[in-house]
Amino acid sequence: MASTPKIIVVGGGLAGLAATIKIAEAGGHVDLFSIVPVKRSHSVCAQGGINAAKNLKGEGDSTWQHFDDTVYGGDFLANQPPVKEMCEAAPGIIDLLDRMGVPFNRTPEGLLDFRRFGGTLYNRTAFAGATTGQQLLYALDEQVRRHEADGKVKKYEAW
């Protein structure tokens, strides 16, 4: 019987935690290394929010408009196929993060609230007050802890 390879993830910020979760969900075993305790990684400083064209305010936003804003905002220097993929994936990622427990701001009706941010033409930025990065980091760390309890992840912090 072949053993499952152990995968090393270096970095306990949002990208490292997301990679760790994805690998663990696929059945892999992960050693996660972070030079600081995960909840002190620099991702905690991200404040603005995450853009996704969910069009909950009925403004006519779309993934194509999101793509156009992103390419234009980057002075047309971005590699456009990955930008298109990112814009198409963004609404589903917001939904996933919401299900993971990120306390995004809500409208009085209980829907996700979106605002304009960073030069966007539409209200497409999902946010958690002024602590979006911290809330994302804490929610993803809780998911990693769940996989730690299952024995799929071993975390090495402050090494």
Model feature map: region roles:
Residues M1-P5:
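A short, basic/flexible loop-to-alpha-helix module at the beginning of a structural domain
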Residues I35-W159:
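Conserved N-terminal/central alpha/beta ligand/cofactor-binding core
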